[in-house]
Amino acid sequence: MLKRILVIIGLAVLATACSNAPRTVSHQVISENDDIQLTGLINNLEKDNRTGIFHKVRTNRSSALMGDKALASVYNEWVGTRYRMGGTTKRGIDCSAFMQTTFSEVFGIELPRSTAEQRHLGRKINKSELKKGDLVFFRKNNHVGVYIGNNQFMHASTGQGVTISSLDEKYWARTYTQSRRIM
């Protein structure tokens, strides 16, 4: 009986853990000398209605999206690292640990380890007020990322690992719950 209860609890935790959004982002290394153009990372797939297959679309790199070289450096260092619940290393990391690492390395701010604690930091702000470095929360505050500008955020998702996504994507727009400014 106890074993069955533990299995059910484990499944519930997995179901509410960091998000598993649709795969719409390609991974690429970003030059620290360039402004980062992340809309190209998000919007570089186009569906062929005839075949239903997505293919890459050429995009320009002119949008100054994430000029902060420290954020670019953290992204480049962690991009593609797989998601691992409770993970804190390059072998696997979860969303709250990735925020903890990012804020420590980029802003010198020590965040608590869990999303449950992070969701109470700083002050709540409207989505329209988002600035680079704000925390964005999803799925009843069980998933967290850092806003990087141009309606995009950096996070660790179960499906893609460390990646960049757009708040405009259906999944993220539907599951967005709040934003918080801690700086």
Swiss-Prot record:
Q: Which residues form the NlpC/P60 domain?
A: 65-183
Q: Read off the SUPFAM superfamilies from this record.
A: Cysteine proteinases
As for subcellular location, the record says:
Cell membrane
Instruction: Please give the Gene3D superfamilies that the UniProt record associates with this protein.
Output: endopeptidase domain like (from Nostoc punctiforme)
The record's gene field reads: nlpC
Q: How does it sit in the membrane?
A: Lipid-anchor
The top EC class is hydrolase
Q: Which UniProt keywords apply?
A: Cell membrane, Hydrolase, Lipoprotein, Membrane, Palmitate, Protease, Signal, Thiol protease
- Where on the tree of life does the source sit, at the highest rank? Bacteria
GO CC terms: plasma membrane
Q: Does the keyword Lipoprotein apply?
A: yes
Keyword Hydrolase applies: yes
N-palmitoyl cysteine lipid sites: 18
The protein depicted here goes by the name Probable endopeptidase NlpC homolog
Give a GO molecular function annotation for the protein.
cysteine-type peptidase activity
Give me any GO biological process, just one: proteolysis
Q: Which PANTHER family match?
A: MUREIN DD-ENDOPEPTIDASE MEPS/MUREIN LD-CARBOXYPEPTIDASE (PTHR47360), MUREIN DD-ENDOPEPTIDASE MEPS_MUREIN LD-CARBOXYPEPTIDASE (PTHR47360:SF3)
Pfam families (UniProt xref): NLPC_P60
